[in-house]
Amino acid sequence: MSQSGAVSCCPGATNGSLGRSDGVAKMSPKDLFEQRKKYSNSNVIMHETSQYHVQHLATFIMDKSEAITSVDDAIRKLVQLSSKEKIWTQEMLLQVNDQSLRLLDIESQEELEDFPLPTVQRSQTVLNQLRYPSVLLLVCQDSEQSKPDVHFFHCDEVEAELVHEDIESALADCRLGKKMRPQTLKGHQEKIRQRQSILPPPQGPAPIPFQHRGGDSPEAKNRVGPQVPLSEPGFRRRESQEEPRAVLAQKIEKETQILNCALDDIEWFVARLQKAAEAFKQLNQRKKGKKKGKKAPAEGVLTLRARPPSEGEFIDCFQKIKLAINLLAKLQKHIQNPSAAELVHFLFGPLDLIVNTCSGPDIARSVSCPLLSRDAVDFLRGHLVPKEMSLWESLGESWMRPRSEWPREPQVPLYVPKFHSGWEPPVDVLQEAPWEVEGLASAPIEEVSPVSRQSIRNSQKHSPTSEPTPPGDALPPVSSPHTHRGYQPTPAMAKYVKILYDFTARNANELSVLKDEVLEVLEDGRQWWKLRSRSGQAGYVPCNILGEARPEDAGAPFEQAGQKYWGPASPTHKLPPSFPGNKDELMQHMDEVNDELIRKISNIRAQPQRHFRVERSQPVSQPLTYESGPDEVRAWLEAKAFSPRIVENLGILTGPQLFSLNKEELKKVCGEEGVRVYSQLTMQKAFLEKQQSGSELEELMNKFHSMNQRRGEDS
């Protein structure tokens, strides 16, 4: 795996609103209020006490055994860790008063550390030397410490220079008996007030949305791609017997990116466990030499870092492991050197470690969503070694029973993961996945049985027209009215549901719906519900994307048959877009996705490349590094087939400037295409970090197995 899995929980991974296409990219008034409120609550100056929001990056002991004998050595080590993305940030508050520097827990306001000013030997800024551009350095040593500590903080809301000036003025007053700080605070107070009044900065006009080439364009035809099975499980249907090659390539790309992100988050979680264990070890070492009743140096910060993940975080990781297993089984024909069968063994290493960390399989057993597909279960049965098989069996039915054999009630909800990178997986790909649709009947046709005809007659009381019935399009559902999700309406009251995720119709019987729409229920079968939109269109929607809604949520009552309906109609049929580029661009993009997958999920050093089974010419990759200038950035953007508007907007930046932009900023500058820019930059960062270092996960697992061996020898 690449080092990107060890990326820290830092700002920039949060999701922002998309850039508006009709003018200026703006924050909503509520978002603006919340941002200003957070800023004003975290960064305040009152009387002789100032407070700043900071992120603790690292604490090093200045010790020859650690190869740190000076501040410069400590900075070099921090830069090295940053380049490998091995820094873990911890949000906290830094308070400065005329007696001490205090670190507070950002949530509980509990004091973590108290550094009396006489123990602060040095304050310094470290600017633009690592991925955190504004860093404050403190060297502290109390009378009981034989060696000083070097603390690093990222000043993400107020510049490090400003915090440094505040601390220096407090130190000068303490050492020299002067009164410089009141004047310093007065100037800083004005700067913070000005900053608060202008958040967020004004945005320029939003770019023109990226235009995809249509399916009939010459570039969209005759693409070479892998063969696809003529029939697949679930309600996936095609108008022709073979899916267009470019569409298949896009689907593989999306599934691969989901797999990348899932594996990144699994590695991130394992590395977090390692960091917590290291902090716990350091904490115990420091406690040994402290006096009774007195805190050891840096004890508060280490205690915070040593906290284990919550149960919810363990559940999230188990869900992503199940998702990764499903995707490995689905993509196994497209993965080689190493194969999916080889890679699953490296997935079970972290799984074993995580199960042991949370004291057994009980938490993992409780995780039913997502279920495994039939292919995933067969894949595991055919490839696990006895020890892995024993671990798998210990996790219970929710891990061993495929979706197709799972009881239909209660309904297992659609699983949409949230990734630490901020990348949002395409819901349509997840909706069609075998682990979501196996065992679900297809959308029903209208006239198939007397029961269905009776349902149609009942529904015609609500609908002005009946649906056309294409022959042989799907199988009938098992009718079970009023049994799903606890809806028990009275005969006189209409029933409504709220859409949880977008859904695109694939034939005339299904209905395309958008997230947060409220629709009227005409039929509520087990798996497919017939709904009617405000525009009067009726059709079937899978029940696992529906949530309960009240009639008042609709905003106004639905009109009776024969009257006009209001509101925009959802599209009834939408074909997937073609890949926006020519053949060479498609092949190059698939090469990059393929190469990135092997870097993310293989912790075998010096493995040969794995390839999709796609005929292609060898592309020339345009490099992008932290040393790239504007010309190289522009060439990289053009090589990635971004629109001219994006190339023009971002082509004036250097490599470090482009890499420093987070997802929210890219969305504001690039509109919807900013998500793709962010995704490509994330992949490029991972590639660069992989070149510099080996696998964090391999190192961790080696340590873990060594510990087990030593324990076995000791026993």
Curated annotation (Swiss-Prot):
Keyword line: Cell projection, Cytoplasm, Deafness, Non-syndromic deafness, Phosphoprotein, SH3 domain
Name of protein: Epidermal growth factor receptor kinase substrate 8-like protein 2
Gene: EPS8L2
Organism whose genome encodes this protein: Homo sapiens
GO molecular function, one term: cadherin binding
Tissue: Detected in fibroblasts and placenta.
Related illness: Deafness, autosomal recessive, 106: A form of non-syndromic sensorineural hearing loss. Sensorineural deafness results from damage to the neural receptors of the inner ear, the nerve pathways to the brain, or the area of the brain that receives sound information.
UniProt xrefs under CDD domains: PTB_EPS8, SAM_EPS8-like, SH3_Eps8
Compositionally biased intervals (Basic and acidic residues): 213-222, 234-243
Main location: cytoplasm
Listed Pfam families: EPS8_2nd (PF22975), PTB (PF08416), SAM_3 (PF18016), SH3_1 (PF00018)
